Amino acid sequence: MILTVQNLSVTYGTKKAIDNISFSIEPGEVIGLLGANGAGKSSAIMAVLGIEKSNYEELTMLGKSPILDRKEVFQEVGVQFQETNFQDKLTILEACEQWESLYKQTADVPLLLQTFGLVGKETQLVKSLSGGERQRLSVLLALISNPKLVFLDELTTGLDTKARRMLWKQLLAMKEKGLAIVLTSHYMDEVEALCNKILILKEGKTVFHGTIQEAIHASEKATLEDAYLHYAGEEDWI
C-alpha cells in the first residue's frame, strides 16, 4: 500500500473533529475525500500529513511513518493546498527552482511547464497570473518531486471547464503510470472522472467508503451527486 490510515481520530478540546476513519490506497489509485464544509476533510488531511496531532492505530506512507520518518517520506510525497501563497516578486521559474531545491530528485520541469500550459510564462511574476494559472502552478509544484503520492485540495476550484478537463487528462495519464492521489473536491463530475473510490465524511465520521457505483447502489439514488447529498446530509437544503 502507498498509504494506510487505520482508526484515525482528531480531537479539539472535547470535540472530535475526526472519529476513527480508515482508508488505504495502492499505486495508481485515486481516493476522493468528500463532505460538506466543516465535515472534517481538512482536519483529516492535516492529520494524515502529520500537521495536526492525532490518534491512530496505523498511519503509514510508502511503508514509513509520516511523523517519525518525515524528511524521508516527503521526498516522495507531494502536497497542493487550496490556497498556495507565493512571494510577490517570485517568477514562475524562480518558484520552480525554490521547490526543486527541497528535493534530492525532481521531475522534468520543462516538461511539467509544457504539460500544465505554462511554457512561455516562465519569467512572469506569479502575482500577475490568472487564478487558473496560479492553480495549475500549485499542482505543478506538488508534482515537482516526481512523487509516488500526492494530496490535492479542491483541485480545480476557480478553473473554467476547458482548464479543468485539461488538468484531469494530465492527472489520469500520471495515474496510469502509478501515481496515487488523495483528492478533495466539491465537483462530482471531477470525482467520477478521477476517483477509484470515495470516502464521505459527516461530522467527522465515515458515512460511506467504497466505489462510486457502490455509493449510487447503496443509496438507491440515480447519480453520484444525489448519492453524495444523501450521505452528506445535504438533501434537506435542496
Q: Which stretches of residues belong to each language-model region?
A:
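ABC ATPase "signature
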Residues: 209-210
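Catalytic Walker B motif of ABC-type/P-loop ATPase nucleotide-binding domains
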Residues: 150-153
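Conserved ABC ATPase "signature" region
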Residues: 97, 101, 106-121
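Conserved ABC transporter NBD signature motif
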Residues: 57-68, 72-73
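A short, surface-exposed alpha-helical micro-motif characterized by mixed small hydrophobic
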Residues: 191-193
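Conserved ABC ATPase signature
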Residues: 125-129
